[in-house]
Curated annotation (Swiss-Prot):
InterPro entries: AB_hydrolase_fold (IPR029058), Pept_S9A_N (IPR023302), Peptidase_S9_cat (IPR001375), Peptidase_S9A (IPR002470), Serine_Peptidase_S9A (IPR051543). Transmembrane segments: none annotated. Keywords: Aminopeptidase, Hydrolase, Protease, Serine protease, Signal. This is Dipeptidyl aminopeptidase BI. Optimum pH is 9.0 for the hydrolysis of Gly-Arg-pNA. No hydrolysis of Gly-Arg-pNA is detected below pH 5.5 or above pH 11.5. Stable over a broad pH range of between 7.5 and 10.0. One of its GO terms (biological process) is proteolysis involved in protein catabolic process. The lineage of its organism: Bacteria, Pseudomonadati, Pseudomonadota, Gammaproteobacteria, Lysobacterales. Optimum temperature is between 35 and 40 degrees Celsius for the hydrolysis of Gly-Arg-pNA. Stable for at least 30 minutes below 20 degrees Celsius. Monomer. Belongs to the peptidase S9A family. Gene3D superfamilies: alpha/beta hydrolase, Prolyl oligopeptidase, N-terminal domain.
């Protein structure tokens, strides 16, 4: 089938991309080469002529001048595409119900929700008192009508962020007596949060502040003490749990627990029944929990001592602990139980058995039933286990989708709330009665002008080069796009840390689909879509599989006619940016343009430096290059080290000056060396957000503006431009 006239009217094929023509005549910034040798403990040495671009304080004038010059060059190259960028941005904003609100949930006698104000970037967090006739449906109706009588505003993030280039509230927590609020905010994207306090009875901000913290907060039962996670100011590792007593200086906060092993990170939370406050410490391959009674916090007692290659996460309800673990060879995890006062491994009793073909992702406990989040064949499912031991699965409506637990703070209910979405179905919140099976839709993300019937999503399986592995791929495209090998395609993947990339609806992607672009989400190894073995096959000495899987998916989709071989774009960020750098080195001819955001591209140098944030947490993900074997293996794929004098695709590289996860100098060095070696004609542009961190700019509209610029660059390179 040929594209309809509507689609053709929105598509123009150009022989030479505007950005390529302009980049050929423009001159990118000069960047000095300065000799520097990076040494490894085992004696290996590497030259890094752009190492000088690193400045931990972000103050070096020569470095800042270079980043600003790169931004100016990007502005110049992108200037002719400003009308397209504006059009893309306007299209996305038009798909937003700007005064939308979340589905309220009830907790301790109050209904909590977030709502947006038309034209504003940030949410308003609010609550309403429970009472006769007050429920999620009535509150949604009131919010939609602009009726905020009886609402108590917890945080107006627009007011808090006013005048700031960057602002983010990472977490907030209401005290058990509902009177006090603690919240954590970040003003530069570095993820070093400041904790602040508010009296909800008076609306007064209290003078107490705690700096350099994680957005992870737990109140004691008496509402006088807040437990929080303190960060190391240099490595940004979550190192200590402290207790702040209101009305006292933060310098006097008591040390509750300190983790000595830098390969672990930590968090703190309450058990499901609020009886315990628990500290969780985890590495890539091990975990340990320590808990204390919430009513009288004291010594945090270890549930089960840490063991290498044994992970567990526990929760408590009633008279037992319920524990998800991979102990005893349960590669895909199982669920066990233990008595409240006997939690060592010898006391664990199997409850949900391990299965080779089903990955147990998590669980939620209720008084009359339990829910297990599972994954099989790269699809999520929710299994409801009833008190009598029987079980049912929550039904999905499509063949490729995403399903997960939603807010369920109360245990004494028969109703389970969950979320559902797909690449064609906007985010939807349902609740299902676990006794009767009745399902109610509480909300679907409103998308003005969107017609789901015009699009199709499907799941295909691409063969990997090993001849035995099948890689799941989720596709979405307009129904009037022919599978004739002529369409442009954007292929996205991540493939690290066991993070599963599930198919979600995207209002920004609709603008691509309406221009005839096929969108492909590749569920490659290194993620956990197919279970723990899928992750293990894409890390450490198996990391190369992540990159070859991505390339093999591209080859398959082109072979099957989903895309033209010369009109393929690739996109990834962070560890997915490592993926982009690797595939551009391994198979540059297969990609017309690559979009790489906050890319982790200098793996060896970063992993050799324990002072860089996250390095020590990740030795079991990439390997420790202080060991010669890992050093040599990482060198085979590290993007910065494998750049060569050859033709590379056009590339859009983005970073944030204050990025805490991938330091800005990695993409800066990468772009400098790439430009020096690249023999291709495609432009390389480098955008640094000078006020942003790993997640980009804050605020919903500014993020859409960033995406519009990047997509305008990509569409131009693919030969697609809007009239």
């Amino acid at each position: 089938m040929k594209p309809t006239s509507l689609l053709l009217a929105a598509t123009v094929l150009m022989s030479t991309p505007i950005t390529s023509a302009l980049a050929a005549s423009a001159t990118p910034p000069d960047v000095a080469k300065k000799p520097h040798v990076v040494k490894a403990p085992h004696g290996a040495e590497r030259n890094d002529e752009y190492y000088w671009l690193r400045d931990d304080k972000r103050e070096n004038k020569e470095m800042l001048a270079y980043l600003n010059a790169e931004n100016a060059y990007t502005d110049a190259v992108m200037a002719p595409l400003k009308p397209l960028e504006d059009k893309l941005y306007d299209e996305v904003v038009a798909r937003i119900k700007q005064d939308d609100a979340s589905v309220p949930y009830r907790e301790r006698g109050w209904w909590y929700y977030a709502r947006f104000v038309t034209g504003k970037d940030y949410p308003v967090h609010a609550r309403r008192k429970d009472g006769p006739g007050v429920d999620a449906v009535s509150i949604q109706a009131a919010n939609a009508a602009g009726d905020f009588a009886g609402e108590q505003v917890l945080l107006d993030v627009n007011a808090l962020g006013a005048g700031k280039d960057y602002y983010n509230v990472g977490d907030y927590e209401v005290s058990q007596d509902n009177r006090l609020l603690a919240y954590a905010d970040d003003t530069n994207g570095r993820r070093q949060y400041t904790i602040r306090f508010k009296n909800l009875d008076t609306g007064e901000l209290l003078p107490d502040t705690v700096t350099n913290a994680e957005p992870n907060l737990v109140w004691s039962d008496d509402g006088r003490t807040l437990f929080y996670v303190d960060k190391d100011p240099e490595t940004l590792l979550s190192k200590r749990v402290k207790a702040h007593v209101l009305g006292t200086p933060a310098s006097q906060d008591a040390l509750v627990y300190e983790e000595e092993d830098d390969s672990f990170y930590m968090g703190i939370g309450r058990s499901r029944d609020d009886k315990f406050i628990c500290i969780s410490v985890e590495s890539t391959v091990s975990s340990e929990m320590r808990c204390t009674p919430a009513a009288s916090p004291g010594v945090f007692t270890v549930l089960a001592p840490r063991e290498r290659d044994v992970e567990y996460q526990a929760d408590h309800l009633g008279d037992r602990w319920v524990i998800r673990t991979n102990a005893d060879g349960a590669t895909n995890f199982k669920i066990v139980t233990a008595p409240t006062d006997s939690t060592s491994r010898k006391d664990w009793k199997d409850w949900v058995a391990h299965r080779d073909d089903v990955f147990v992702e998590g669980f939620e406990l209720f008084d009359g039933f339990s829910v297990v989040a599972e994954r099989a064949n790269a699809l999520e499912s929710l299994r409801v286990i009833k008190a009598d031991g029987s079980s049912d699965y929550v039904k999905a409506d499509e063949s490729a989708y995403s399903m997960g637990l939603s807010a369920n703070p109360e245990t004494g209910t028969d109703w389970l709330r969950y979320s559902y979405t797909s690449m064609t179905t906007p985010a939807t919140t349902y609740e299902i009665n676990t006794k009767t099976g009745e399902r109610r839709q509480l909300k679907q993300q409103p998308v003005p002008g969107y017609d789901a019937s015009k699009y199709v999503t499907e799941r295909v399986w691409a063969p990997a080069r090993d001849g035995k592995t099948k890689i799941p791929v989720t596709l979405v495209y307009r129904k009037d796009v022919a599978r004739d090998g002529k369409a442009p395609m954007l292929q996205y993947a991540y493939g690290s840390y066991g993070a599963s990339m599930d198919p979600n609806f995207s209002i920004t992607n609709v603008s691509l689909l309406d221009r005839g672009v096929v969108y492909a989400l590749a569920h490659i190894r290194g993620g956990q879509e197919m279970g723990r073995a899928w992750y293990d096959d894409g890390k450490l000495y198996n990391k190369i599989n992540t990159f070859t899987d991505f390339i093999d998916v591209t080859d398959y989709l082109v072979k099957e006619g989903y895309a033209a071989k010369d009109r393929v774009a690739a996109m990834g960020g962070s560890a997915g940016g490592l993926l982009m750098g690797a595939v551009s080195n391994m198979a540059p001819e297969k990609y017309k343009v690559i979009l790489t955001l906050v890319p982790f591209v200098d793996v060896v140098t970063t992993m050799l430096d324990p002072t860089i944030p996250l390095t020590t947490n990740e030795y079991d993900e990439w390997g420790n290059p202080e060991e010669k074997g890992y050093y040599d293996y990482i060198l085979t794929y590290s993007p910065y080290d494998n750049l060569q004098a050859k033709a590379y695709p056009a590339m859009f590289v983005g970073t944030g000056l204050w990025d805490s996860q991938v330091q800005y100098w990695e993409p800066a060095k990468y772009v400098a060396r790439l430009r020096d070696l690249n023999t291709g004609k495609g432009p390389v542009v480098f955008r640094t957000n000078m006020e942003a961190g790993h997640g980009g700019k804050s605020g919903r509209f500014r993020q859409y503006r960033e995406r519009a610029e990047m997509f305008a660059f990509m569409l131009d390179q693919l030969g697609v431009a809007s009239k």
